[in-house]
Each structure stands twice: as structure tokens, then as C-alpha cells.
Amino acid sequence: MSEIIQDLSLEDVLGDRFGRYSKYIIQERALPDVRDGLKPVQRRILYAMYSSGNTHDKNFRKSAKTVGDVIGQYHPHGDSSVYEAMVRLSQDWKLRHVLIEMHGNNGSIDNDPPAAMRYTEAKLSLLAEELLRDINKETVSFIPNYDDTTLEPMVLPSRFPNLLVNGSTGISAGYATDIPPHNLAEVIQATLKYIDNPDITVNQLMKYIKGPDFPTGGIIQGIDGIKKAYESGKGRIIVRSKVEEETLRNGRKQLIITEIPYEVNKSSLVKRIDELRADKKVDGIVEVRDETDRTGLRIAIELKKDVNSESIKNYLYKNSDLQISYNFNMVAISDGRPKLMGIRQIIDSYLNHQIEVVANRTKFELDNAEKRMHIVEGLIKALSILDKVIELIRSSKNKRDAKENLIEVYEFTEEQAEAIVMLQLYRLTNTDIVALEGEHKELEALIKQLRHILDNHDALLNVIKEELNEIKKKFKSERLSLIEAEIEEIKIDKEVMVPSEEVILSMTRHGYIKRTSIRSFNASGVEDIGLKDGDSLLKHQEVNTQDTVLVFTNKGRYLFIPVHKLADIRWKELGQHVSQIVPIEEDEVVINVFNEKDFNTDAFYVFATQNGMIKKSTVPLFKTTRFNKPLIATKVKENDDLISVMRFEKDQLITVITNKGMSLTYNTSELSDTGLRAAGVKSINLKAEDFVVMTEGVSENDTILMATQRGSLKRISFKILQVAKRAQRGITLLKELKKNPHRIVAAHVVTGEHSQYTLYSKSNEEHGLINDIHKSEQYTNGSFIVDTDDFGEVIDMYIS
């Protein structure tokens, strides 16, 4: 064999060879493909496990066998690099959703090495199989392996956006990549929105993808950094540990760390904090303990008495990996080249891949369906002339002769003739003839559907959306990482992080609050709300997750609760008591609840108390940044209670009704705007031992429904009310009796929205229709509805 010797300069040879090497490690080793989010070794591991039947529904198999398969067929490198990649795919502190399930020691968050491959066992996770689904339907291209003995996929079908879900990290020649993991449900929702609107902005996408979602949890800060990374591919965020404070029996406090930043070595973190203690870099730490066990991660930092725990925590954030900065560098292989990509480009590349995958699969299924249709048509034709076919076959010399005769005499095709001669005798029954005709109809429908998908781009996109929704429904999980953005520090509107969604807000009279999806509400209906015995619905309305709920109590206080912080609970289930969200006193009860979309409004609230005080305050006064404690809405004096809170867009008439049957109607224009801590002015001039039972807005078309303790209901029209001035005594609405006089225990303004009433005693309740109560004159006591001897004395009434 003759040798060819080239005379080349060392500079040219080194440049050329290093260029080839760089291209190889960039494309074939260190960087993931944007379409399936996998590096070549990861793809080969998953494909080797799939093709050998090592799937989630089978038994675990020795890891060494998989490593051998990968090295022998696809990846001619050392076994350690393959095993390390395989182990990483099984580590739930590295991947948001593991792609391999592993039995045995697969390492730890302390960076302990895994057991040798001969000891551990593994199989594909259920989600990993979604990356490989339909790979046998010619959905992706295959190339020869390194020795041309078999084929391997260039990319996996990847039925979910794995690059964003599990992220990636790697270093190659001249390139590095750091893509954080995200929440699967959020990523899929953003992809669906992108399909619906390819011009969607990054800001709009961030309503669905709130930010990274690390498998180790933690707290993410820096929404500007997230937005910048999603726009350009590069950005910086802060990731800090979740730290809580506990008090020990001896009065000391300790900081408890339950979540640490992504890819931080826990044992190194504990060691670093202990070094800071030992070196007396920080004064006040007694001991650092790693209390992690099978129940979860836990690091305890015991503090000296009377030290400022907040200062120590801040010091540790600054001087240890209790807080780190994470730098986005979203580089991936796209069209065979490394590219720095924003989130829109990543989703777009993934979507184009899915369009190709679904189109290829549809073509494959269409081809198979058409081939089968051709066979079925031949079988049906043969069965229609069965006797002649049998006679022809019997007269033939052999199988080949029979096929040729069928083709020549009856014009069957080669494929149809083959199917006919292979037909078994038992298939000639009437049942199988009917089955073939049924299969023919099904194939016709399937072929029509598949052709529609191929001919109609929107139909193809709908298939992608349906399959993404299925995966979202099957594999969605709660977000692990909390995203915080303090307005003063980050300078960004927090609303960007809250997905805009219309929901149903509900509040019960006993203080149970929840938000419910409109779908759950519509499926159940108002009447099927989950309630405790004796409780009833106070209010429900459609709100947005970006709105704020103001909950007012009888103590004159209000709770400021962003809607998105309310628990998302099904309509038929019991809500969350407001005291679990914001602590309130035991004898504090909810009076009313209102939803605010924008506090920059001219609307105002009117507050009325039992002892006849009233106050007006504008809505902007109620905006706050404090969510963790009740705030003052109005000053309520001792031995008094707030009984009514109303919200008006402009001045209007209100009616006051008292226990002894007095009524005063006047306009809110008589009230001056006051601050939140003011007690207000006199609403009505009360008689001795009288008190207010109702203060509500009223208009000309309304009626008033009143209930007395003796079981009587009285309904009057608006015209009986006499508009007067504030602080007067008003008019009498009851006929005075010397013996056992009627006293009004409850009253409500009836509008067109109300149709039913409910009367309550201590042990009974009575329901009825408001329209059944006839309107009365001014000086009457109404009509008896219940017998108090049986029902008990009436103590309250609600309308709905």
C-alpha cells in the first residue's frame, strides 16, 4: 500500500484538526439539541433502553447491561462517561422530571458517588417514554451508528419541550450552556399559547411561564433577569435557600433550611457555614447540624440567645451558597449549529419539530391504513365470489400458481392475492365478512381524518395541542421554586408573574373563602357549593387572579388578599378559613367581601355600625403592601360592631332600619370622605335601647324585606321610605303593640337579583320565595310565616 505524505505547516494542521475536534464536541458531546433537549449520549442511553424493552412497565434491569448496550452499539467511549450520564438522568435533585428510574445508590445531593453499575438497576420513567413515543413510525431520521451495523435516531420525537422542562448544562470548545429547568405544566401552557398566537410577546409568555422551577425548590429573585434571559438567552437571577425560624425550649432560636439553591452541594454548604462559625466571621451561631433524613432536606443553624437572626441570615446569604446567582446562557444546537436562543426561539424550534414529527407519523399511519384498506378491499371482493376463488385455488398447482391465477382471472393485485391465499378457512365465516366490512368503514374514516390532518395545517396544530394537553394533565405538578420580586428592589410589576385567569371567588358567612375555576363552578352550579353544617354562601362573583380581595370584619378591620394567593379549590369542596390566610380574633366574623381590580378609582366604601355610626372612605386608601395581618378600615368603639360595608361608584340613597322599626333614608353625599382610622358620624338618631339592624343602598325599583323575632315577614316598597337628612330619627315601619311587640331582627334591600329568603332560629331554618310576601302598608307588622312555638324565636334572615 502506497503512502501519501503531505507537506503542511504545523499552524494549518493544528488549526484544521482543532476545528474538527471543536465541531465534534460541540455537536456530538456537550450541547443539547433544541428539539429534544438531549445531548447525544443521553439520547443514545434512552434509545438503547427503549429498543431493548427496558421500559417503565417492565422489571428493573442492571445498569451495566444498559451501559454495555450503549457502548457496543452507539457510543464508543468509556463506560464511566455513559454511566455518569445515565445516573444524572435519574437524580431528582438535578432534573425537574427524572427520565430514568434507578434502584440502588444513585448518588446524593452531597455529591456522593453512585454505586458501581453492577449494583444498580434502572428502567425508563413513564415521562421519558413520551420523548420516544412514535419513534417506530418514521417520525424522525435515523443515521448509521459508528460502525454501520445498526441505526440510531438523530433526534427523538420528544412529545413535550424537554429542553425547557429539564434544562441542560455543559461546556464545549468556545461554548457553554446553562438552561434552567422549568415547570412542565407552565411550559406546555406557554407552548399552547404560542401555537394560538405566534406573535405572542415575552411579557405575555411570562404570564404562563413564571420563571425557572428548580427540583431543589428555593426562592428566585430578579424578574428583570428572567425577562432578559427569555428575550435574549442571557440573564442573571438570584436563587436563595428557603429559611424558616424555630424557637427551641431553652428560648434559643434556630434557622431551619429546607430548600437550597440548584446544583449547590449540601455538605459543602454545611461545611462552609460551620467554617464561618469556627472562624468567628459571624457572631451568634452556636452549632450547625445536617439533619437531613428520608423525610427531606433539613439543615439546622442554632443561634445564641438575643441575637438578630435576620442579620445572621443576611450575612450567610452574602458569604455562603445559601444564596447564589444563576446565569442563564441558553445555548443549544439548532439546524446543526450552536445558537444562543430566547424562549420564543426555543418554543418555535420545538413547535417546528413537532409539526414535522406529527406530519411524518400521520403519513406513516396513512400509508399503513391505505395498504390495509387495499388488502381489505381484496378480501371483501374475494369473499363476494368465494366459491369461484376456492375452485380456482384448488385447481392451481401451488401457491405461486394460485396467486398468478387470481391476478390474471379476477384482476387482484399482488398484495391482495397474497392475502387471499394466506387466508385461513375459519376466516370464511359470516362473522368475519361483517368484521371486514366494519374494518373497511373504520379505515375509510381513519384515512379521511389522516388526510385532513396532512392537508390542513390548523388540524395538524390541533393534534399537537391535544397531545400536549394530555401530557400536561398526566404529568403536571405543583411549582417547587417560589418567585419573589420586591418592588423597591427589583423595580418590576409583580402582576407579570401572575397568570391572568378568570375564576369564581366565594365567601361563606362563617368565613370560608376560595377561588374556583369557572369550569368547576359551571359543572357544579351555585347550590352545590361545599359548606359546613349551618353555613351558607355570603357572596360569589367572577374575578381575575390579578385582582385583590378586601375582606371586612365586624371589628372594623379588613384583610388585603391577592386573589392568586387564595387556594384553588373545587366548588364542591370546603374553602379555606380566612384565619388560615391572615390571623383574626376568635370572635371576629366576616361582614362582606369585595373585589378590587384597580385602586385608582373614584369609588368609595361606606361603613355602618350597630350603634348608628357611619363613615365614607375612598377606595385608594385601602391599597397596601402588607398581607400578613388585619388592617384598620374604620374605628369601631367599645360595645359596638360593624354590621354593614357597602361599595358605591357614586353617591346614592341608603336606608337605615333599626330593631324597633325606625327607618331613615338619605343620600351618601351628606357624608364627607374620611381616613381609615376615623370613627365617622351619627347615621340615625336612635331611641333608647334601640340599635341598627340594616344599612344598605336603595333605589326606586327596590323593596325592603324585614323579619321580626315573632316569625313575621314584612315587605314594603320604596315609595313608603321618605328621603330625609342624616342623623334624624326617621319614620316608623311597625305597628306598636303593648304586649310582646314586634322587633326587627334582620332586614335587606330586595333587588331584581333576589328571589328567596331563609329564616333562622337557633335550631331551625325556613325557606321561601320573596314574591310570596305581599307588600304591606307602613303601619303594619307584616304576615306570620312561622309559628315560634315550634320553630323558635327568629334570630336572623338572609336573602339570595
Curated annotation (Swiss-Prot):
GO molecular function (one): ATP binding
Site residues, Interaction with DNA: K39, H75, H77, R88, K94
Residue span(s) of domain Topo IIA-type catalytic: 31-495
GO CC annotation terms, alphabetical: chromosome; cytoplasm; DNA topoisomerase type II (double strand cut, ATP-hydrolyzing) complex; extrinsic component of plasma membrane
Active site (UniProt): Y119 (o-(5'-phospho-dna)-tyrosine intermediate)
UniProt-listed SMART domains: TOP4c
Xref: InterPro entries: GyrA/parC_rep, Gyrase/topoIV_suA_C, Topo_IIA-like_dom_sf, Topo_IIA_A/C_ab, Topo_IIA_A_a_sf, Topo_IIA_dom_A, TopoIV_A_Gpos, Type_II_DNA_Topoisomerases
Site (Transition state stabilizer): R118
Protein location: Cell membrane
Protein function: Topoisomerase IV is essential for chromosome segregation. It relaxes supercoiled DNA. Performs the decatenation events required during the replication of a circular DNA molecule.
Family to which this protein belongs: Belongs to the type II topoisomerase GyrA/ParC subunit family. ParC type 2 subfamily.
Catalytic activity: ATP-dependent breakage, passage and rejoining of double-stranded DNA
Highest taxon in the source lineage: Bacteria
Name of the protein described by the UniProt record: DNA topoisomerase 4 subunit A
Pfam families: DNA_gyraseA_C, DNA_topoisoIV
Organism: Staphylococcus aureus (strain NCTC 8325 / PS 47)
